[in-house]
């Protein structure tokens, strides 16, 4: 298969993975309207082409939370990444480090913090949910500190799990799910050998370390459902701000008022995100939500965005809408499933090249120059940019 874009990696991942894993990563909540709009709304954004601008001094590098990034991209926290490739979190982290960008480890990763951090030569980020088990949260924060994690990403848009109908059809959940998953693995022998057998253990490493016993895929949904806390508020995060002295980013912001609350709380950054369309179907795409949020808080904290980003062109679009950087989620998991560390490195190379082309043809010499001026007048006046 010729690989020239993230869509090619998606097709390769679907061919390699058992359906329950592919659709768990690929799917969204309910009828998946928001999932689709995340992509289509970005595609609808027209850029303003400029020519004869002498683009010989182009630079993609940027500063974020005291770190120098080769481009304004970080790998997003994605649960169960270690089920998509053998010790997948380690492979993805190495790919990110090789391309000079941060990797964010999920709370519900297969590989624990202590396995991933020593595998790379740059600090990583760590994502944490707000859970009922505050002892787990404190333990995770202590371990993150000990491992040299620099930036903490708090996901706040999961006080309850989303309803993902596709999971019931694919075998991730629903009747006879364990049997269906086993049968699917048998019909995908390459994955079964490389990941299913050689990729063990398949525990949720960060949780198993805390509980002192394996917490595998069978326990995943139940443990999370029991620990998500619908009572959380900004006040509940105050002890975390006192405990964690490094940069802290609040992930899951879609409303300008919530963004202002994040500023008042003292967050160093936010992620404009609808969880990749996996939580509440029918909410705004990140691309539609971003401009109003940028108008409200730009300059008071760093603004990151995710959901729907599939190319370097999409990265430029998000920056033009007001983001300082983006998180890349599904796209890197497609590449990881299809080609491991090399696949992720190649995807990041493609994104960098696409960014360069877009910046040259919009006349923007640096990441700092990318602004609303890079958008066409038609786009600025259209409903896609509120």
Swiss-Prot record:
<dbReference type="InterPro" id="IPR020920">
    <property type="entry name" value="LldD"/>
</dbReference>
<dbReference type="InterPro" id="IPR037396">
    <property type="entry name" value="FMN_HAD"/>
</dbReference>
<feature type="binding site">
    <location>
        <position position="164"/>
    </location>
    <ligand>
        <name>substrate</name>
    </ligand>
</feature>
<dbReference type="Pfam" id="PF01070">
    <property type="entry name" value="FMN_dh"/>
</dbReference>
<feature type="binding site">
    <location>
        <position position="251"/>
    </location>
    <ligand>
        <name>FMN</name>
    </ligand>
</feature>
<keyword id="KW-0560">Oxidoreductase</keyword>
<dbReference type="GO" id="GO:0005886">
    <property type="term" value="C:plasma membrane"/>
</dbReference>
<feature type="binding site">
    <location>
        <begin position="306"/>
        <end position="330"/>
    </location>
    <ligand>
        <name>FMN</name>
    </ligand>
</feature>
<protein>
    <recommendedName>
        <fullName>L-lactate dehydrogenase</fullName>
        <ecNumber>1.1.-.-</ecNumber>
    </recommendedName>
</protein>
<feature type="binding site">
    <location>
        <position position="129"/>
    </location>
    <ligand>
        <name>substrate</name>
    </ligand>
</feature>
<dbReference type="GO" id="GO:0004459">
    <property type="term" value="F:L-lactate dehydrogenase activity"/>
</dbReference>
<keyword id="KW-1003">Cell membrane</keyword>
<keyword id="KW-0472">Membrane</keyword>
<dbReference type="InterPro" id="IPR008259">
    <property type="entry name" value="FMN_hydac_DH_AS"/>
</dbReference>
<feature type="domain" description="FMN hydroxy acid dehydrogenase">
    <location>
        <begin position="1"/>
        <end position="380"/>
    </location>
</feature>
<feature type="active site" description="Proton acceptor">
    <location>
        <position position="275"/>
    </location>
</feature>
<dbReference type="GO" id="GO:0006089">
    <property type="term" value="P:lactate metabolic process"/>
</dbReference>
<dbReference type="GO" id="GO:0009060">
    <property type="term" value="P:aerobic respiration"/>
</dbReference>
<comment type="similarity">
    <text>Belongs to the FMN-dependent alpha-hydroxy acid dehydrogenase family.</text>
</comment>
<feature type="binding site">
    <location>
        <position position="24"/>
    </location>
    <ligand>
        <name>substrate</name>
    </ligand>
</feature>
<keyword id="KW-0285">Flavoprotein</keyword>
<dbReference type="InterPro" id="IPR000262">
    <property type="entry name" value="FMN-dep_DH"/>
</dbReference>
<keyword id="KW-0288">FMN</keyword>
<feature type="binding site">
    <location>
        <position position="106"/>
    </location>
    <ligand>
        <name>FMN</name>
    </ligand>
</feature>
<keyword id="KW-0997">Cell inner membrane</keyword>
<dbReference type="InterPro" id="IPR013785">
    <property type="entry name" value="Aldolase_TIM"/>
</dbReference>
<dbReference type="InterPro" id="IPR012133">
    <property type="entry name" value="Alpha-hydoxy_acid_DH_FMN"/>
</dbReference>
<dbReference type="GO" id="GO:0010181">
    <property type="term" value="F:FMN binding"/>
</dbReference>
<feature type="binding site">
    <location>
        <position position="127"/>
    </location>
    <ligand>
        <name>FMN</name>
    </ligand>
</feature>
<feature type="binding site">
    <location>
        <position position="155"/>
    </location>
    <ligand>
        <name>FMN</name>
    </ligand>
</feature>
<feature type="binding site">
    <location>
        <position position="278"/>
    </location>
    <ligand>
        <name>substrate</name>
    </ligand>
</feature>
<comment type="function">
    <text>Catalyzes the conversion of L-lactate to pyruvate. Is coupled to the respiratory chain.</text>
</comment>
């Amino acid at each position: 298969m010729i690989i020239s874009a993230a869509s090619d990696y998606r097709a390769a991942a679907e061919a390699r993975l058992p359906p329950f894993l592919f659709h768990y990563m690929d799917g969204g909540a309910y009828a998946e309207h928001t999932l689709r709009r995340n992509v289509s709304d970005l595609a609808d954004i027209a850029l303003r082409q400029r020519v004869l601008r002498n683009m010989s001094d182009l630079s993609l590098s940027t500063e974020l939370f005291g770190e120098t990034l080769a481009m304004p991209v970080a790998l997003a926290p994605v649960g169960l990444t270690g089920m998509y490739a053998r010790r997948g979190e380690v492979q993805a982290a190495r790919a990110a480090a090789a391309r000079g960008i941060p990797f964010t480890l999920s709370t519900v990763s297969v590989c624990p913090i202590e396995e991933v951090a020593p595998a790379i030569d740059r600090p990583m980020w760590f994502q944490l949910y707000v859970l009922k088990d505050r002892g787990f949260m404190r333990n995770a924060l202590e371990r993150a500190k000990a491992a040299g994690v620099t930036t903490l990403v708090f996901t706040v848009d999961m006080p309850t799990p989303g309803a993902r109908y596709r999971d019931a059809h694919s075998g991730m959940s629903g009747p006879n799910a364990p049997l269906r998953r086993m049968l699917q693995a048998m019909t995908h022998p390459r994955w079964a050998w490389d990941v299913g057998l050689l990729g063990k253990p398949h525990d949720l490493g960060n949780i198993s370390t805390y509980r002192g016993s394996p917490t595998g895929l069978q326990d995943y949904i139940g443990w999370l459902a029991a620990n998500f806390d619908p009572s959380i508020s900004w006040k509940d995060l105050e002890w975390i701000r006192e405990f964690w002295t490094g940069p802290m980013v609040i992930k899951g912001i879609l409303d300008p008022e919530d963004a202002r609350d994040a500023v008042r709380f003292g967050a160093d950054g936010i992620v404009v995100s609808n969880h990749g369309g996996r939580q509440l179907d029918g909410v705004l795409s990140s691309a539609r939500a971003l401009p109003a949020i940028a108008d409200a808080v730009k300059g008071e904290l760093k603004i990151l965005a995710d959901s729907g980003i599939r190319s370097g062109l999409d990265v430029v679009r998000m920056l033009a809408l007001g983001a300082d950087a983006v998180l890349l989620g599904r796209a890197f998991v497609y590449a990881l499933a299809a080609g491991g560390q090399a696949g992720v490195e190649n995807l990041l190379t493609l994104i960098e090249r696409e960014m360069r082309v877009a910046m040259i043809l919009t006349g923007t010499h640096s990441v700092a120059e990318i602004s609303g001026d890079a958008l066409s007048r038609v786009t600025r006046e259209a409903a896609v940019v509120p």
